[in-house]
């Protein structure tokens, strides 16, 4: 997607917070469906974060989520909102 100065860009930050105890497969499917819907609506970008200090979290690595979304979206740009380097082996 190229820069278009004639219109405003729209995007979201997908906060990596999910309630403890919910089905992780369904929660991840909801996140993916949301981003697919935003892609169809014409949103320009989505930023996916990670969070390790909340105890339990579904998205431990935004890169894996982005890889899955790259196959399911068409034009929306995908990026990591946060990558906590100490939690990832080089």
Where are these regions (language model features)?
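Conserved strand-turn element in the central/C-terminal portion of the radical SAM core barrel
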Residues: 79-87
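Glycine-rich anion/phosphate-binding loops
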Residues: 26-29, 86-90
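N-terminal beta1-alpha1-beta2 module of alpha/beta enzyme domains
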Residues: 1-73, 77-80
